Amino acid sequence: MRALISVSDKEGVVEFAKGLEQLGWQIVSTGGTYKILNENGVKAVEVAQITQSPEMFEGRVKTLHPKIHGGILYKRDDASHVAQAKEFGIEGIDLVCVNLYPFKETTIRTDDFDEIIENIDIGGPAMVRSAAKNFKDVLIVTSVLDYDEILQRLKEGTDDLEFRRNLMIKAYEHTASYDATIANYMNERFKGGFGDARFIFGNKVFDTRYGENPHQKGALYEFEYFFTNNFRALKGEASFNNMTDINGAVMLATSFENAPVVAIVKHSNPCGLAVKDSLLESYVEALKCDPISAYGGVVAINGTLDRALARKINEIYVEVIIAANVDDDALAVFENKKRIKIFTQDNKFLVRAGDKFDFKHIDGGFVFQERDVVSDDELKNMKQMSKKHANENQLKDAQIAWKVAALTKSNCVVYVKDGAMVAIGMGMTSRVDAARAAVAKAKELDLDLHGCVLASEAFFPFRDSIDIASKVGVKCVIEPGGSIRDDEVIEAANEHGMSLYFTGVRHFLH
């Protein structure tokens, strides 16, 4: 039996090759892999000895040869294939171990296009695809994580068809994602990311018990190993809906750099947020906005969950806590709470993945766009449209309200006072209804909106929302502007003695 080993990632390859040798396999290898194997006592045969053809064009051509691909592809149970292999002096290759040139890593490390091009693997994907096509006869190995299991199965004789089929699937996933990465990179470099095709792929992190509803299957996939590196379960398992809520909560909590932010989310909608002097104070103030909706919600903590904060959260039922870090004694507080789920990023503060693009599934396809981000320039360059100036505290609240509004389902309005969200209306078909809903909820909870700041993610089409805001004591309004009735909105703000600022940037969220 012969194994062809040609890998860019050399981790574990010596041990794997030695394991194969101990089982009686002959090792065939190329270039750097051949060198490291021989230096470590593996009696490998160089590919050039088999092909009788040297590496060409600075290593661009090594394994693209009938004696390699023929040895991989011929069917062992087809007499004509066996006869042809014998006729042309082609010996079988029964295992192919290949991982590919580090294209993605090269694009991160350098912008040198010549170097990037040289890290596009040609022979590697060809061998992987050949071996995967003939998976019944050839084991295809593309992951370091599979080395031990393959050796064990070969030793036991349990490398059955199902196992080989699973390796085949993994191999095609490997080459497909590799080619997609190259295509997306070229697209982004030369066409701004919006070429004729766009490839979206991820690696599975875990299956969820079900999808959005019990009759649907679900799973979490990741880009660039984000969750592998930044998500750990401390208590319980995340559901599909948990992950979408966690995403919304983390996006909110990470909108204010390293500030001690606590965000509370229910069904991906914010129902509480505060930026105070401590995480404990932020949680207490965030909860006041809508304690009814917070029941069974998701709490995101931009910092460490300590015992004091844990005890406060434990006074009500929340389903999920996601924190940058969690103290051991804080975790112990929830020891007897069976239903709560606790996750950490194991970081000092919560982090985002920094995805550059966003997409939404629609029936028959998807729409694709650049990710919406609130830039600092929007707030630095906002224009005062009213006669009255906002004071320093109001400007701070305007920043919070504006960032929350940008992450809230349209149409929305957000009311913030003293660093805490005090009312919110979202997902409404008219903006004035969002304003009315927010005020009604605040009155129901006996929350004082006097002196607060109002933000809207899109322009106010009429002055009616400003008139409603004035009745509850709003003192400052921030919105994009851009309505044909902006003059009426400005007039209303001046009539009610409000300060009004236009950012010039809309942040619809659907």
Swiss-Prot record:
<keyword id="KW-0511">Multifunctional enzyme</keyword>
<dbReference type="GO" id="GO:0006189">
    <property type="term" value="P:'de novo' IMP biosynthetic process"/>
</dbReference>
<dbReference type="Pfam" id="PF02142">
    <property type="entry name" value="MGS"/>
</dbReference>
<dbReference type="InterPro" id="IPR024051">
    <property type="entry name" value="AICAR_Tfase_dup_dom_sf"/>
</dbReference>
<dbReference type="InterPro" id="IPR011607">
    <property type="entry name" value="MGS-like_dom"/>
</dbReference>
<dbReference type="Pfam" id="PF01808">
    <property type="entry name" value="AICARFT_IMPCHas"/>
</dbReference>
<dbReference type="GO" id="GO:0004643">
    <property type="term" value="F:phosphoribosylaminoimidazolecarboxamide formyltransferase activity"/>
</dbReference>
<dbReference type="GO" id="GO:0003937">
    <property type="term" value="F:IMP cyclohydrolase activity"/>
</dbReference>
<dbReference type="InterPro" id="IPR016193">
    <property type="entry name" value="Cytidine_deaminase-like"/>
</dbReference>
<comment type="pathway">
    <text>Purine metabolism; IMP biosynthesis via de novo pathway; 5-formamido-1-(5-phospho-D-ribosyl)imidazole-4-carboxamide from 5-amino-1-(5-phospho-D-ribosyl)imidazole-4-carboxamide (10-formyl THF route): step 1/1.</text>
</comment>
<comment type="similarity">
    <text>Belongs to the PurH family.</text>
</comment>
<dbReference type="GO" id="GO:0005829">
    <property type="term" value="C:cytosol"/>
</dbReference>
<keyword id="KW-0378">Hydrolase</keyword>
<dbReference type="InterPro" id="IPR036914">
    <property type="entry name" value="MGS-like_dom_sf"/>
</dbReference>
<protein>
    <recommendedName>
        <fullName>Bifunctional purine biosynthesis protein PurH</fullName>
        <ecNumber>2.1.2.3</ecNumber>
        <ecNumber>3.5.4.10</ecNumber>
    </recommendedName>
</protein>
<feature type="domain" description="MGS-like">
    <location>
        <begin position="1"/>
        <end position="142"/>
    </location>
</feature>
<dbReference type="InterPro" id="IPR002695">
    <property type="entry name" value="PurH-like"/>
</dbReference>
<keyword id="KW-0808">Transferase</keyword>
<keyword id="KW-0658">Purine biosynthesis</keyword>
<comment type="pathway">
    <text>Purine metabolism; IMP biosynthesis via de novo pathway; IMP from 5-formamido-1-(5-phospho-D-ribosyl)imidazole-4-carboxamide: step 1/1.</text>
</comment>
